[in-house]
């Protein structure tokens, strides 16, 4: 029997590292192309553009920037306007209010009030009415400048009426003034409106009925 011959040793494969040849680094079109690294940030295109507000941050005088100067001017104008309005309101003079009138004549009105039955026994009522009439006409925007005095002329418990004498100072020989400012409708209307706005304590129904007041010269 033939003995098996030993197998030939297998040749070991040698692995060699392939190195890039210099000519392989050259691109086909002949132009070198540089690829940015991942760690490098590509600046945005807008970064090269100047902001339209950048001029406001420029120093004009020392450390004062342009926006500071504009804001100061704006606030200064507003302050001047406010001060001017305040001074105008304080120094305003109403020519009509301060006009000195020559009230050389007197105008007399008699006003009679009918007292409700529940108020006849009120002893202080005539005094309260005197104070009320004085306050009404002395503080009236229309007649306050001309009002002089008010006095009780007659008080009748039986007829439940009280009559007052109203005195006003008026310019002489002024028909328009007497027609519009000292008309009976105006003098009586002021008192009626006051009774509607505020009643007499203890006699709430007094003056609410227009027929309970009579004005005559």
UniProtKB/Swiss-Prot annotation:
It comes from the Eukaryota. Induction: Up-regulated following treatment with 12-O-tetradecanoylphorbol-13-acetate (TPA) in the pancreatic cancer cell line HPAF-II. The up-regulation by TPA is triggered at the promoter level. Residues 1-37 are annotated as: Disordered. InterPro entries: TTMP. The chain crosses the membrane at residues 66-86. One of its GO terms (cellular component) is plasma membrane. Detected predominantly in the skin, with strongest expression in the inner root sheath of the hair follicle. It is found in: Endoplasmic reticulum; Cell membrane. It is a single-pass type I membrane protein. Its main location: endoplasmic reticulum. Keywords: Cell membrane, Disease variant, Endoplasmic reticulum, Hypotrichosis, Membrane, Transmembrane, Transmembrane helix. It is linked to Hypotrichosis 15: A form of hypotrichosis, a condition characterized by the presence of less than the normal amount of hair and abnormal hair follicles and shafts, which are thin and atrophic. The extent of scalp and body hair involvement can be very variable, within as well as between families. HYPT15 is an autosomal recessive form characterized by sparse to absent scalp and body hair. Eyebrows and eyelashes may be sparse or absent as well. Has a role in LIPH-mediated synthesis of 2-acyl lysophosphatidic acid (LPA). LPA is a bioactive lipid mediator involved in different biological processes, and necessary to promote hair formation and growth. Interacts with LIPH. PANTHER family: TPA-INDUCED TRANSMEMBRANE PROTEIN. This is TPA-induced transmembrane protein. It comes from Homo sapiens (Human). The lineage of its organism: Eukaryota, Metazoa, Chordata, Craniata, Vertebrata.
